[in-house]
Amino acid sequence: MLYRNRDLDLDARNDDLANSNSDGRITQVTRTLYSKWKLIKMKTYKNLYPKLCSYKNLELAFKKAGKGKSKKFYVIKFKKELKQNLFSLKKELELETYKPSRLTKFTIRDPKTRLIRKSIFKDRIVHHAIVNILEPIYEPRFITDNYANRLNKGTISALERFDIFKRKVSKNGKLVSHALTNNMIKGYVFKADIRKFFDSINQAKMIEILQRKIKDEKVIWLIAKVLKNFDDKKKGMPLGNMTSQFFANLYLNDLDQFVKRKLKMRYYIRYVDDFIILHESKEVLKNCRDKIEKYLKNLRLELHPDKSKIYSLYKGVDFLGFKTFYYHRIARKRNIKGFKKKLITLKIKHKEGSINYNKFMESVCGWFAYVMWGNTYKLRKNIIKNINRFLLDNSLSS
């Protein structure tokens, strides 16, 4: 997949490269890459449904849906008669009699309060089966700097990319002309958040986006079934479904293309509904903000007025759980508070015996692996002391 490596599939430079073909300034390799990109852009897909319904695909979907949940009762129950259950599901899909079950609702605080709607295990297998077919089609069309729910991406990669972009925009840390301290670095960041994103996704628009490439009516029928299994039959997608994560990326891919190709913004990063654009000019970013607000109306979305602002780079930007400055990065207070609450719950569960030592440490280490990307040495040191004291007391009392 050579055409993926240098953003030739999605960057605005594609059009410039094609236009420069006449004066012989581009190489044969570049012309070949551009041709491949054009073919990918124009290609449509039919006869996908038999592959989606195949036993092989459903078996793979079962493995993905059950990953890390092998001890859950619903996975054990489904696995007991795996072949029979998968063939039964296959038949439902082929006869188009499949109907998703009602969603289970529950609230989580991480630390933000979110309403999660969860599908039963059988429906989750169908979700994975759909994504197994669609992901290879759409993955080459996503921009490099879309970091949510993608292989070899994630928050850490997005933060690393942010570090690269801030150095480029500030010309490696040049100071503003009126700098009073060595921290007053050049450059600006437009930090934006889409208001009530998952609840605002227009289902008809989502189908319209899919139909540009997917010309198999049965696949569209199944996706429509999944989308409409929601409180509101016209808009919104449930947080928690595999399909929701994938469709969220696809829905905002139009925005990504607009920012990169039309606005020609090189330093753009998106993670689900949070995105940032870096530039040396505040006026350019103001213009971008206005055009993005207008463009989002086509997607029936709007920017969050309180969370979408332009900041001086040296003042720091809240992004993906950290406030990032030019020379350092600190963890958000609410994230630290949220973890400390979670740690109390983990301690209680470990003391009661509902989770073992390995499970306890797995949860702790997962958070540590993330927060160590900030300047959090003292914080981590204090939490480690707290955990060691708890484990020692717990071992003495048992």
PLM features: residue spans?
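C-terminal, surface-exposed recognition/capping segments
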Residues: 1-37
